[in-house]
Amino acid sequence: MQNSKIEASRNVAITGQGCFYSTILAGKEFKIPNGVVRGGEVIVNEGNIIAKEFGGPTGISTTARIVKNGRITANLVHPNVGVAIGEQSYRFSETTSMVKVFLQGGILTVYSGSNKIHG
């Protein structure tokens, strides 16, 4: 999917290789377990965002945002990728693997594997 906009009241699942320079708005969940989100943004009202990879090695601006509550998970996140849950956000400055983002005690918490890197 390239240069597109998708809006759904429930779940969005992408089975192809990736989303490039696109905007995805989902009510409950966004999944692209075997692909990349490179450029653009994914916004979920309440639920999870799951991707194999966010951003790209050149630092293309990419955003994953959950409006209310949920988790963001990715195998790989590149620099200049922003993640947010509610009003709290974090921007990656280096390539990071095994990423989990969630609210813990109301604080945005970011893990790389078992290492806490924010929160």
Regions found by a protein language model. Give the residues of each.
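Intrinsically disordered, low-complexity terminal regions
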Residues: Q2-G119
